[in-house]
Amino acid sequence: RTAKYEKKEAIRLEKYEKKEAAYRKKHPDSPSAPVKKKKRKFQTLEDYLPIEKIANGIVYTTDHRYVKILEIEPINFLLRSAREQQSIIYSFISYLKISPVKLQIKMISKKADINRHLEQSAKELERESDPRCRELQRDYIQFVRHLSSREAVSRRFFLIFEYEPFNVNRKTEEKEILAALETAAQTAKTFLYQCGNDVVMHENEDEFTTDVLYTLLNRTLCTDKPLPERITEVLGQRMAEGKDVDTIHCNAFTAPESLDLKHSNYVRINGLYHTYLMVPSDGYKNKVTPGWLSLLINAGEGIDIDFYLHKQPKDKIQQRLGQQIRINRSKIKDASDTNSDFDDLDSAIRSGYFLKAGLANNEDFYYMNLLITITASDLEELQWRIQEMKKLLISQDMDLRSCYFLQEQGFRSSLPLASLDKKLYELSKRNVLTTGAAS
């Protein structure tokens, strides 16, 4: 056995030496020892989030952008008369003409927390002396409890934009950036007030911004553990570990406890299932009515909407539009009117002239993207909600597709940082004029 083993070992060493000699002959400059692969760097959830710090009511991102988040009080647009709706749209058009180039409008929905309201109603009931009024108040409390058990949903709306430098080559100081963002926020407040919307003012803007991120990343945790409790808990853990509390990163308070990105069609955050869907470029209707997004906004609990608008340079678009119309007109001459290509080309030419007329009528050209986030406590409920959402959009002649193998990009794009992933942007961008965007 020993002789046989030694013979095998000798053959193995001989083969190894031949391979080594052949490798040296082919790569004379390379070292003989094989290069070790670099170990993958361990990344915590705090490091993963693209946020450097939150200060002065602004989010400083890791890619050196400055983002402002405004909370907007909504109005019930569908209950307004046709004349009022038209007036609101024109007021919003006025804002879009002077708004930042990139805008993100975010809507988050979750089950309404009515405990505070019920506590206040109970206190008023105790103070009431009239027995008939007490009876009415008891009925009201019972009605609110019954209603909240089935369909009570609270919605919050946010307008997000970033600082846009006037001159890219010039270095801008931080105080100039803060002043520019504050001016943009005041402009938004003035014009949205004309639409009937109020911008919610907060005593501590940093705390508000941190709370928004904490609520988004910790859907279930934020109801049981508000942000002040979370901050106290994290600080206590750091002190117990003997770490410096003064240098703690803001992501330590907002980061979720667990984040699972291993699946192709969903993301798990703190055990809650999130899936991201998009309306593809060809999934929109050609004509829209005022308030056409209300259907998605009122879809129910666990449905979040991210609406992106990216204004394009007018002169470049007009040049490209004229060029494309000329190309399509030359193509249609060679196509027969019985071919399916003829209808597509005819539609493209008509759309081109429509956009050309709109631009000549002082409208702006935008690329619009629509990202939908669906959350559920288990996979079965998640699949049911996805199917129901797709049916809802099909009923309105719209299409909806899951972001397969792009869930991580969907997660990062859904953060209130006015940053849509490039691949998702290309897959879902749709051209729209100011009137369509404002509707």
Residue ranges and their predicted role:
Residues R1-A438:
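Extended, folded cores of ATP/NTP-driven motor/assembly subunits in large transport
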